[in-house]
Amino acid sequence: EISPSRGMARRAAQQVAGNCRIVVVDSETVSVGQAMLVRVAVRAAQEQDTLEDVVRVVRGAVERIYTVFYTESMDYLLQSRIMSPSHTILGAMLGIKPFLSVENGRLQPMEKVRTRAQAIERLVEYAVEFSDIEDMVILQHKPFMSEQTRMLQERLAVEFPGRHFPYGMYGPSLAALIGADATGLAILESEIEKDDDDFF
């Protein structure tokens, strides 16, 4: 896993188990993706009748969160063992920028691009693959808008007219794994409503 937080949360829950009911849900994501789940949990707590229903809603949202990054350098990916030394050396020689996704709580290499413009375009292509997006946030590691984020917002505005997607910072724990020069997207896909008319 990316972080030991799940195990720590379970131990903490056991310590106070006698005072209240606590259910630990593995977010299987990072950074803004976790913030999206918190908002889902708050809304579910207001709308649902039981703790079980709240947990069901949150676990359903876990399956609808997708996070991807590209990073300008591979040094941190080598140190965190996300990429092998041979791939890192070859990538540095070719000047490529790796794409990463968060899959089942792990950072996984997806593909590679050669230029920043290609990386931005690939992020946009990834976003437009979704037919209905409930929420999407651009991820960066700076308090002010980076040039990559500005480019990405402009491209997303073309593909999603009438919608604005803000940017947020990913924290030091993630920066220690992927570096401080990554740009990414956290996407919460809209929940698909089941149509009872299709029942046979």
What are these regions (language model features)?
Residues E1-V23, T29-F200:
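Mixed-charge interfacial surface used for oligomerization/domain docking
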